[in-house]
């Protein structure tokens, strides 16, 4: 079973038979159905079915000229809201199947963000019309989460918040300059990182890491599109899986200046957001 089926309320699937029934339900009573031509005899087919507000399952495969569907794979999804980043986005096809990943480097985080492309069919149609040189300048991110913990925020004065915002802004400017090959910017970033490492190492001797760090995003595990994150909760609401009746928490987070939504089963969230 896909590891993140749990995040949309299907964590109690016990065997392959139950999973097959769910996939069959998506194929037969879908919310949305899309086709993209592959060749004269075959279309790439995608069935989407929503099981709650913004959460659902995609089933992808091939549809032949006789409308016979050949199943390839399935994946849970969660639709985010708003624009997360206005950085340039590039798209690459996965090696093992007809699925795509997006890559963008936002100066707020300073790393390449790799993500699974949710609107694959729209991308393929645009590529057929406009060729392979499609460029995107914004992206809406969303996250599937299996568990989470609510922490008390780090206490800051107004002056500390203002100073932090200035530091973040200055770092973004340095990162932008470093990308163009500016040696002074590269040197400044290197010295800043060394200074930060030294300060944090000293504080960790007597303080807990969560009293020092209030937001982060970093790769998790060996797969390129999995991350461990911590951020400020800006909005919080509940939805429910229509089949399992499990409550799902939907939270809008501010993570290193990136705004995006995540969904996580309520029973797997430790603590209550204020």
PLM segments and residue spans:
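Generic recognition of flexible, low-complexity loop/linker segments
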Residues: 217-220, 237-240, 272
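Short amphipathic beta-strand/extended segments with alternating polar/hydrophobic composition
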Residues: 113-115, 261-266
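OB-fold (S1/OB) nucleic-acid-binding surfaces
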Residues: 235-262
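N-terminal alpha-helical "arm" segments
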Residues: 1-40
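Long, hydrophobic alpha/beta structural blocks
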Residues: 38-234
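Short nucleic-acid-contacting surface segments enriched for D/E, G, S/T with interspersed K/R
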Residues: 267-274
